[in-house]
């Protein structure tokens, strides 16, 4: 008589549970190469948007570590435009795994946001990561088409995961997700107003270091450079005198004077060669050294202030391993190029980059959807200096009064950053010591900021307030 082990019984029970939930068996990720053992399930695969065009978006879904049946669902989108949410958000910032120091395995991210929520990462639009289209014109994308495709994606993804339709839905992201997330939220609210059936249970949006208003975000870059001693008094003064950013455009020559362009070019030359402008604090990882050590299967990690500054190269190496792509059900079209974080295929509308997002955010907040904007204070690419002003402008336009004045918030009895709240629906917070990718550089503070938002709580302004992530 055959003897059935407890392990076999457990595996059968897991399989039955997966089938019972109605989740897609073919998308179940059994285990990633080099992955530590975990108790939660993960899924990955494609959602077809247009069969005639052959346009499909790739996703990676991770259940909450505990109680996934009752935890909310959080969508995360990276920016760019044109950068991978799977590679960036999932495997570098807030997902459950980080690549190991030599890029051939994974280690646990002890501050993963799946401690608080189910997580969904989507490579959007088509042409980013493993998302694709068989029609080359689809790679001419913009804000409107990106939001439209993501709305279709979510509707069809919920058909794959019907049990999650009723869960609270939070939309989150960073950088150019300052465009992606508000426009998707706006599309969802419009869909809900028209639908007589299913409605998205949207509960809030949170965006880190977001591009919101180009004519304010751009001058903030040079204010940051000057205030951090990264450019000279002469260059800083020249930019202040010569540059009128009120009609600045993304495309060169930016609709500014030649003297202004000369000054900002000089500022860029001074600051970008030896400093990571996305995080001005840590040392750089030099690719030639990192890649050489990867080939030798040695630790390429060069730790600086507790941050693995070479993780970008480790992630690149790991996600290009064929066995990893097979485990993720990725690259089903056998793309003729290596996976990379940001797309070289995408031709994204430069005009859309100029769009002021405040009217869209205003509509969202008027629909009683809470908005939390947060900024890593060591990011010079979309600095908090501009974002703080922009959020204040939005609050003024909404006629919101200050409900919590600007002041420190705490985490683990240390200053986590500074925050201000307007009208009980709009919050701006800095994260102390964090970069453009907040969750990567300050993972514990980022998880705390995220968890409090999900629970509808304010960031604690006293050290003795007991709060759990």
From Swiss-Prot:
Expressed in flowers. The active site is at 175, 379, 436. GO terms for cellular component: extracellular region. GO terms for molecular function: serine-type carboxypeptidase activity. The keyword Electron transport does not apply. Residues 1-20 form the signal peptide. Glycans are attached at residues 134, 255, 331, 347, 461. Its main location: secreted. SUPFAM superfamilies: alpha/beta-Hydrolases. One of its GO terms (biological process) is proteolysis. It is found in: Secreted. Keywords: Carboxypeptidase, Disulfide bond, Glycoprotein, Hydrolase, Protease, Secreted, Signal. It holds the Pfam family Peptidase_S10. Disulfide bonds join 83-342, 243-260, 285-310. Its EC number is 3.4.16.-. Probable carboxypeptidase. Belongs to the peptidase S10 family. This is Serine carboxypeptidase-like 41. It comes from Arabidopsis thaliana. The gene is SCPL41.
């Amino acid at each position: 008589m055959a003897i059935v082990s407890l392990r076999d019984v457990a595996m059968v029970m897991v399989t039955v549970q997966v089938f019972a939930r109605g989740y897609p068996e073919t998308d179940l990720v059994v285990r990633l190469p080099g992955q530590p053992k975990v108790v939660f399930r993960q899924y990955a695969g494609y959602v077809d948007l247009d069969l005639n065009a052959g346009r499909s978006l790739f996703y990676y879904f991770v259940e909450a570590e505990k109680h996934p049946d009752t935890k909310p669902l959080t969508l995360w989108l990276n920016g760019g435009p044109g950068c991978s949410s799977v590679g960036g958000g999932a495997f570098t910032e807030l997902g459950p795994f980080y690549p190991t120091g030599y890029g051939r395995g994974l280690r646990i991210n002890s501050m993963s946001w799946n401690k608080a929520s189910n997580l969904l990462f989507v490579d959007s639009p088509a042409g980013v990561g493993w998302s694709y289209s068989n029609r080359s014109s689809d790679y001419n994308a913009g804000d409107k088409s990106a939001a439209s495709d993501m709305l279709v994606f979510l509707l069809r993804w919920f058909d794959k995961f019907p049990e999650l339709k009723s869960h609270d839905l939070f939309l989150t992201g960073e950088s150019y997700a300052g465009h992606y997330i508000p426009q998707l939220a706006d599309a969802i609210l419009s869909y809900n107003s028209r639908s007589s059936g299913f409605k998205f249970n949207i509960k809030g949006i949170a965006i880190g270091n977001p591009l919101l208003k180009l004519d304010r975000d751009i001058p903030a870059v040079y204010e940051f450079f000057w205030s951090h001693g990264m450019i000279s008094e002469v260059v800083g003064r020249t930019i202040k005198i010569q540059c009128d950013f009120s009609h600045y455009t993304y495309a060169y020559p930016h609709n500014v004077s030649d003297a202004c362009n000369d000054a900002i070019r000089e500022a860029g030359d001074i600051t970008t060669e030896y400093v990571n402008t996305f995080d001005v604090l840590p040392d750089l990882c030099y690719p030639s050294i990192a890649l050489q050590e990867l080939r030798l299967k040695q630790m390429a990690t060069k730790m600086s202030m507790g941050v693995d500054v070479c993780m970008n190269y480790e992630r690149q190496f790991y996600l290009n391993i064929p066995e990893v792509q097979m485990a993720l059900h990725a690259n089903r079209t056998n793309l003729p190029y290596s996976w990379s974080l940001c797309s070289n295929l995408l031709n994204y509308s430069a005009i859309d980059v100029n769009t002021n997002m405040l009217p869209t955010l205003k509509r969202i907040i008027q629909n009683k959807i809470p908005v939390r904007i947060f900024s890593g204070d060591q990011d010079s690419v979309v600095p908090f200096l501009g974002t703080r002003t922009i959020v204040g402008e939005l609050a003024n336009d909404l006629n919101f009064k200050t409900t919590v004045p600007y002041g420190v918030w705490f985490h683990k009895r240390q200053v986590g950053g500074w925050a201000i709240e307007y009208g009980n629906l709009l919050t701006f917070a800095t994260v102390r010591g964090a970069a453009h990718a907040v969750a990567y550089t300050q993972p514990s503070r980022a998880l705390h900021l995220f968890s409090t938002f999900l629970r509808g709580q304010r960031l604690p302004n006293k050290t003795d307030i007991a709060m759990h992530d």
